[in-house]
């Protein structure tokens, strides 16, 4: 019986606080907690995507440095829209290119492979993500690649795009019309064979 009296007194004196907590404070607290967790999730997802992209760039750069010219037919079969006389060659330098300091606009190209002899150099864009590659991205890449070719004095070059998730149909038509090579072949991401 005493518990019942205590409960009635407690509810009467604290009912406003209980109602306020149940209808406003608790949902606000959970909303803030959810937003904080969502923000952390987005940050981690962004880092994961960045690492995924960097991994793909690294593996493709390794393939171009050590494997592509040795297994020319295999690597050509993984590409579309290459010039008829294209062959992978030994590249003097293969790296991810960043525009010089104070260059306006600042830009970054995923892969620049400069040919040693008279072969084709490669300027590449790498996308290792779920979304397909779009025409808008192709135009932006083409613009950056043109600026890179001018800055680095790259003469004979092939632009190429690697997109693990493929391309929109209108993007393939655009790439073909512009003479840009492309690939969605996962074999590019196979680790290069050691000791060759």
Please place each PLM-identified region on the residue numbering.
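Short acidic loop-to-beta-strand element that houses the catalytic metal-binding Asp/Glu
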Residues: 106-114
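Acidic-basic catalytic patches of nuclease active cores, encompassing PD-(D/E)XK
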Residues: 39-102
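Basic, amphipathic alpha-helical patches used to engage nucleic acids or provide basic targeting signals
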Residues: 123, 133-153, 173-174
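Active-site beta-strand-loop-beta-strand hairpin of nuclease catalytic cores
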Residues: 113-123
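Short, amphipathic alpha-helical interaction segments positioned at domain boundaries
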Residues: 4-43
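Short beta-strand-loop-alpha-helix junction that forms the active-site gateway
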Residues: 126-135, 164
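Domain-level recognition of nuclease-like catalytic cores that cleave nucleotide substrates
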Residues: 153-196
């Amino acid at each position: 019986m005493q518990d019942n009296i205590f409960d009635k007194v407690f509810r009467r004196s604290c009912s406003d606080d209980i109602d306020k907590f149940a209808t406003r404070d608790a949902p606000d607290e959970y909303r803030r907690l959810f937003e904080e967790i969502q923000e952390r999730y987005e940050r981690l997802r962004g880092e994961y995507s960045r690492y995924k992209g960097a991994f793909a760039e690294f593996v493709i750069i390794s393939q171009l440095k050590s494997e592509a010219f040795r297994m020319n037919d295999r690597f050509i079969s993984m590409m579309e829209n290459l010039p008829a006389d294209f062959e992978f060659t030994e590249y003097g330098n293969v790296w991810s290119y960043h525009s010089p300091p104070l260059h306006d606009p600042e830009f970054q190209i995923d892969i620049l492979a400069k040919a040693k002899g008279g072969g084709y150099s490669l300027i590449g864009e790498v996308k290792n993500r779920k979304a397909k590659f779009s025409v808008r991205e192709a135009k932006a890449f083409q613009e950056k690649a043109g600026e890179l070719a001018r800055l680095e004095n790259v003469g004979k070059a092939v632009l190429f795009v690697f997109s693990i998730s493929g391309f929109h149909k209108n993007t393939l038509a655009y790439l073909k019309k512009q003479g840009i090579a492309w690939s969605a072949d996962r074999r590019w991401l196979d680790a290069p064979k050691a000791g060759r």
